[in-house]
């Protein structure tokens, strides 16, 4: 469950929409519409936000462990993507044993013309023709690890999402969504 620092971010979002702060998401003795709404949206929104950008605070560099006895579907090698913390998105890939990294957004999106596919991902397994793989990836980190700008954007986005449910105000939700988008651009 979320850390105390994470509860602070959740409460900042709740207060933004006129709701009372909560002490915990773990209270199982009474059913609270606020806690239910937060639980329904929290993890989805956090993971979506983390995947949306290459955040410094969520980027991890690692060498992948090669797997054996795995169907490589025509590729030479198979590697397990990180599980703890979970790899949400591979953002950079090294073809030279970690000496230099290729930014995948630049490689696939910003250069004109067809590009060689460097790897494929199937069920949390990275398939490629590189003998030793190093990646930089966006990890599913705890909210307490967010830097200040990302935390601020998250609070605004959570408030916007919750505004549709808790005060049930489309107008407030639309305003908060615009505010969240501005904060996201700054982050």
Region spans (language model):
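Glycine-enriched, solvent-exposed interface loops adjoining structured elements
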Residues: 1-187
């Amino acid at each position: 469950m979320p850390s105390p620092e994470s509860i602070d971010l959740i409460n900042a979002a709740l207060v933004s929409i006129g709701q009372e702060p909560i002490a915990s998401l773990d209270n199982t003795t009474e059913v609270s519409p606020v806690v239910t709404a937060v639980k329904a949206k929290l993890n989805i929104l956090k993971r979506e936000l983390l995947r949306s950008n290459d955040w410094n605070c969520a980027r991890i560099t690692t060498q992948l462990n090669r797997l054996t006895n795995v169907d490589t579907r025509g590729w030479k090698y198979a590697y397990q993507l990180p599980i703890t913390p979970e790899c949400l998105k591979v953002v950079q890939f090294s073809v030279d044993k970690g000496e230099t990294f290729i930014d995948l957004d630049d490689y696939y999106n910003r250069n004109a013309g067809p590009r060689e596919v460097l790897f494929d991902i199937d069920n949390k397994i990275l398939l490629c023709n590189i003998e030793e793989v190093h990646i930089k990836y966006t990890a599913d980190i705890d909210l307490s690890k967010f830097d200040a700008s990302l935390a601020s954007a998250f609070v605004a986005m959570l408030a916007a999402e919750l505004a549709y449910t808790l005060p049930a105000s489309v107008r407030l939700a639309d305003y908060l969504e615009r505010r969240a988008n501005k904060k996201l651009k700054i982050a």
